[in-house]
Each structure stands twice: as C-alpha cells, then as structure tokens.
Amino acid sequence: MKHKYLIAVSGGPDSMALLNKKRHLVEAVCHVNYHDREDSDNDEKIVRDYCKKYNLKLFVFDTHKDDVSKYKDINNLQTWYREIRYDFFEKISQELGIKKILIAHQKNDFLESAYMSLNKNKKNLFLGIRRKSKFRSLILIRPLLNKTKKSLEQYCRSKNIEFVIDYTNFWDRYSRNVVRKMMAEWDKKTFQKFYLKVKWFNLKNMFFIKLLDSKFNNWIKQDFDINYFLKIKNNYKESLIYLFLNHIGIKPNENKIEQIIEFINKNKNGSVKKYRLKENQFIEIKNKKILYSIC
C-alpha cells in the first residue's frame, strides 16, 4: 500500500495539526486512552469526531477496557505508557501491513530531549529526536521537528481544529516537565541559540552517524552475528549495542550497554547463559548469533 501511513493521535494540538496536514496519506489513526486524567475521554472524543468527519479508520486502545495485565510489573509510569503505546502501534501495524507511523514530536520536544541528554553527561552522538527512526518492526516518521508547539496551536486555531491541552504536561512529577517549564521561559534569542548549538553538534557527527547506521544495517543482515560485532572497532561497539537495544524496543542506558558488551565477550564461543534485559526479556548467544527472547 504505497504512501499510506498509520498516525499516532492523542488529541493534543501537535498530533491534531499533523493529522490535518497528512490525512490524505493516512490509512488509520491510532489513539490510546490511558485514563490518566479525569477528562481523558474528551481527548478520545475529539479524535473520534475528527475521524468520523473525514471518514478515517480509527483504532483505540483503552486501558479500562483492554487487557493491560502484561504490564502489571512495570513500576515506572512513563515506561508503562510507552510499552502500552508501542505494543498497540505494532499490533495495528501488523494487522494492516503498514510499517510506517507518523509521530507528532515537534521542535520543543526535540530541544527538551537534547537538553536532557546534555544534562545527563551521556556519550552523545546525536542530540534531540531523529526525524526518522526504527523501533521494533515500526518505522517512526516525525514531520514536525521544525515546527514549534506554539505555531502548531496557532495552526489548529486558524483551521478551527479542536484540540485538548494536557494539564499534566505542567506537573513537576516528571523531569521532562521541569525542563519544559524552564524552556518556556526562554526568550526567542535563547531558544534559537540553543537550537543552533544542537543542530551544529548533530551536523559535526553526521558522517560518523551515517557510517554507524551502515554498520548496524549490515549487522541486521547478518542476523546479529557476533563475529561481525567482535571485528568492529571498539569505538563503534557501544553505539551498535545502543542501536540494537532500540531495535528490539529496549530503552538503552550506559550500564546495560557495557554489560551486554561484556556478556558477548565472555560468551563468544557459545553458551546457554542468558542476559536479562528486563522482566521476562533476554538475549542469548546461539550458533554465533545474538537472539532476543521473551519468556
């Protein structure tokens, strides 16, 4: 099905603007009702009404109606949201045979992510959010990274598109919200200065990133053969494991990356041992290949 996409729509201004701009390319709309606010049903209604108006196919995951028992051991709320969301997107993707999904991350989200990465003193090759990335079997496409949240709200108002503002975005419960509130106080000059700093950082690393992507794609083609990995220069290995974890839908961190490299080095001759990624998810080495499993 050429040029057809799924789209994730929350009912907020970003995703409603994206839906309106790209609806001619959309095969189906995906909405998750987490029931995390008293008025979350209103978000769903806004999305339903829009889809009905333009005769768009809509799929809804409702945490009060659909089975969420598999997520009961997840203690971090943001991780809980993320796992539910992407499992749902992947399910619809497989049902419809469409791998590409439009995501409404915008310029503010991009800079918030960049700021948080810099604050963690991580070994960064790329700051912010990529326009296109792969997550499990999904291809995520973010067309709005050059648009500010304010401009998207203005767009919705100019087109009389109904949207909802999620008041939990202003709670200090989450570190991203603290960064969001801080950046909201920046003037245009400070905002643009930081944006250019991030873009320049990414531009400087572009050659290395492209080379790394090429090596990772070759590794995928070789079914994650450990001999291929072991021959790679050490300065690429951490980044390859980072991409591997993203590829299988596991959130990377430096400790996990270092432990996996150590696991591969210790078990390069084959072993029945498994490395636990989280809860019931593991990797093991069999026939010189890294295998991912859910038990």
Swiss-Prot record:
SUPFAM superfamilies: Adenine nucleotide alpha hydrolases-like. It is found in: Cytoplasm. InterPro entries: Rossmann-like_a/b/a_fold, TilS/TtcA_N, tRNA_Ile_lys_synt, tRNA_Ile_lys_synt_N. Keywords: ATP-binding, Cytoplasm, Ligase, Nucleotide-binding, tRNA processing. Pfam families: ATP_bind_3 (PF01171). Its EC number is 6.3.4.19. One of its GO terms (biological process) is tRNA modification. Transmembrane segments: none annotated. GO terms for cellular component: cytoplasm. HAMAP family: tRNA_Ile_lys_synt. Belongs to the tRNA(Ile)-lysidine synthase family. Ligates lysine onto the cytidine present at position 34 of the AUA codon-specific tRNA(Ile) that contains the anticodon CAU, in an ATP-dependent manner. Cytidine is converted to lysidine, thus changing the amino acid specificity of the tRNA from methionine to isoleucine. This is tRNA(Ile)-lysidine synthase. It comes from Malacoplasma penetrans (strain HF-2) (Mycoplasma penetrans). The lineage of its organism: Bacteria, Bacillati, Mycoplasmatota, Mycoplasmoidales, Mycoplasmoidaceae. The gene is tilS.
